[in-house]
Design a protein with these regions (language model features):
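A short, proline-enriched helix->beta-strand linker immediately N-terminal to the Walker B motif
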Residues: 170-174
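Short catalytic/signature loops enriched in Gly
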Residues: 4, 236-317
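P-loop NTP-binding/switch modules centered on Walker-like glycine-rich loops
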Residues: 43, 57, 177, 181, ...
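Conserved ABC transporter NBD signature motif
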Residues: 64-76
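A short, flexible loop at the N-terminus of ABC-type nucleotide-binding domains that lies
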Residues: 2-5, 14-27, 58-64, 81-85, ...
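Conserved ABC ATPase signature
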Residues: 151-155, 159
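Conserved ABC ATPase "signature" region
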Residues: 76, 128-146, 255
């Protein structure tokens, strides 16, 4: 097996709050192989986006990385000074942010925003060379050269999202984190955006971490899926296993909540509400909503352990 391009070990993130500490990410561990498509799924507030920001060392006060380590190709990101970490962003690991509407600078043309990314990383190019590079990047994501001269408000939602992909991949990163890249887009545009992301990934031979809660989209795109609940990874498995034989009760509940065109019957919701991250229940955080919870689940927090080709944090897996 090839060496992981990204290695996350027991990463924890907390936020200070007047009513108590908010444990947004709790000892998350996983590895990402070169060229792999890895998904992170879970309800809103489960810690997915916070985990992505922690991997990029972009957590701002009152948040902090409490513990754990992130490595890229053997280098610990915690050991890098701010200048080297800034250089690694875009060039080594890049983020396609959630909500392109709020991610692009409204007063700068798209071409200028790409050129600024080049300049920020020390790439000095003649005007003509920069223009050719920008045109090539836009073509890579299926946008015409004229987009370089346009402002964000002149683009549709799908075009904005593809412009964000162009900016994120302008320095050919080895890892692309796509945080809900299809949110607020209709299904036709969603497909176009995901096809664009897949094409760019293949051309760059990059690995992708896709964050979202659309299990159908995950099933079509990722190779392996990590399911998060209350800041913890509760299951990691090949996507086919997640869909056909989920092992964690929360994963099973997520799959059961999906409407099906085949059965056309009633689908089951997940009872109760996700817990407050500053007031987590003892033991397994899912036990108040779990149909098979026992006394042990209320007392002991299950650890992520190997079960065949999967990893599951459940006492009964």
């Amino acid at each position: 097996m090839s060496e992981p391009v990204l290695w996350v070990e027991r990463l924890s993130v907390a936020f200070d709050h007047p009513l108590g500490k908010v444990q947004a990410v709790d000892e998350v561990s996983f590895q990402l192989a070169p060229g792999e498509r890895f998904g992170l799924a879970g309800e809103s507030g489960s810690g997915k986006s916070t985990l992505a920001l922690a991997m990029l060392r972009m957590i701002k006060p009152p948040g902090r990385i409490e513990a754990g380590e992130v490595r890229m190709t053997g280098t610990s990101l915690a050991d890098l000074d701010e200048d080297r970490m800034r250089a690694l962003r875009l060039a080594g690991i890049a983020l396609v942010p959630q909500g392109s509407m709020n991610s692009l600078n409204p007063v700068l043309r798209i071409g200028q925003q790409i050129a600024d990314a080049f300049a920020d990383h020390g790439l000095r190019m003649r005007h003509g060379e920069a223009g050719r590079r920008i045109t090539s990047l836009l073509a890579q994501v299926g946008l015409p050269a004229s987009v370089a001269r346009m402002y964000p408000h002149e683009l549709s939602g799908g075009m904005k999202q593809r412009a964000c992909i162009a900016i994120a991949t302008c320095l050919q990163p080895k890892v692309i984190i796509a945080d809900e890249p299809t949110s607020a887009l209709d299904v036709v545009v969603q497909r176009q955006v995901m096809q664009t992301l897949a094409r760019v990934q293949q051309e760059l031979h990059a690995a992708v971490i896709l964050i979202g809660h659309d299990m159908g989209l995950m099933a079509q795109f990722v190779d392996r899926l990590g399911v998060m609940y209350a800041g913890r990874l509760v299951e990691i498995a090949p996507i086919a296993d997640i869909i056909t034989r989920p092992r964690h009760p929360y994963t099973r509940a997520l799959i059961a909540s999906l409407p099906s065109l085949e059965t056309r019957g009633a689908f089951a919701g997940i009872p109760g509400l996700a817990p407050l991250l500053r007031d987590l229940p003892s033991g397994c955080a899912f036990h108040p909503r779990c149909s098979i919870a026992a006394e042990r689940c209320r007392r002991e927090k299950p650890l992520l352990r190997d079960v065949e080709d999967s990893q599951v944090a459940c006492h009964f897996a």
